[in-house]
A protein has these predicted regions:
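Long, terminal "pre-/pro-" and other extracytoplasmic accessory regions
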Residues: 1-227
Length: 227
């Protein structure tokens, strides 16, 4: 019948739709992702789940489940939030961000318990727990400007850059922020592309690279306007 024919035609998926269905089969469910998330962030009863979404990242990495919880009490002037994203394929935590005005205000009345070195150890311990394999492939990259003019830093951030074959990979890193008063991890994100890296064989030495640069680029003195 015509109806049967129309139903059959409607059921035919485009190549893009077929690809999307196949991809979706690889993804963990919302409930599975939520269970993983709650292993790494403590969500108290006061929080309300505001958003839960599955999205695809722009840089070609896997899709992620993202969750956000909020707490807001205008009468007490209290505000807090927690957000976390979980890789929908590998089940790894991709990012964490959290803030609680109550804890923040209380801690600032005292003195920081964590200096930079103690905070760095807390960051390294956290990375060893949440992303051990990736952390083992990184190198700490100090920020020379971090809190240089701050008497009592509220937090410290630490950046660990990915290295492959002894070579740094810009844009691939693990970053952690530690509260200097409590030692709590308040921010974490992982930028880590799934790439095949070529072997570092038969590379030019640094001197040969400089020689090639200067031989092929014509340098001239110029007057320029400095903005």
């Amino acid at each position: 019948s015509d109806n049967a024919m129309m139903a059959k035609e409607a059921a035919v998926l485009t190549p893009e739709e077929i690809k999307e269905v196949e991809n979706t089969k690889k993804f963990i469910t919302r409930e599975q992702a939520l269970e993983i998330a709650k292993k790494y962030v403590k969500v108290e009863d006061k929080y309300k789940l505001e958003a839960a979404s599955l999205y695809t990242d722009y840089n070609g990495t896997n899709a992620s489940w993202s969750f956000s919880w909020n707490y807001n009490n205008p009468e007490k002037n209290e505000y807090a939030y927690i957000s976390i994203s979980v890789d929908a394929v590998t089940k790894e935590v991709r990012s964490i961000s959290k803030y609680d005005s109550t804890t923040d205000n209380a801690s600032k009345n005292g003195n920081p318990e964590y200096d930079m070195e103690k905070s760095k150890k807390a960051a390294e311990k956290f990375l060893s727990m949440i992303a051990p394999e990736k952390f083992a492939q990184t190198e700490y990259r100090p920020d020379i400007f971090q809190n240089s003019n701050v008497e009592k830093p509220v937090s410290y951030s630490f950046n660990f850059v990915r290295k492959v074959n002894g070579i740094s990979c810009p844009g691939n890193n693990l970053n952690v922020t530690v509260n200097a008063y409590t030692g709590e991890i308040t921010n974490f994100y992982s930028n880590w592309m799934d790439l095949e890296f070529p072997k570092a064989d038969d590379l030019l030495s640094i001197d040969a690279a400089y020689e090639a640069l200067y031989n092929n680029v014509e340098f001239k003195l110029k007057y320029i306007i400095h903005y």
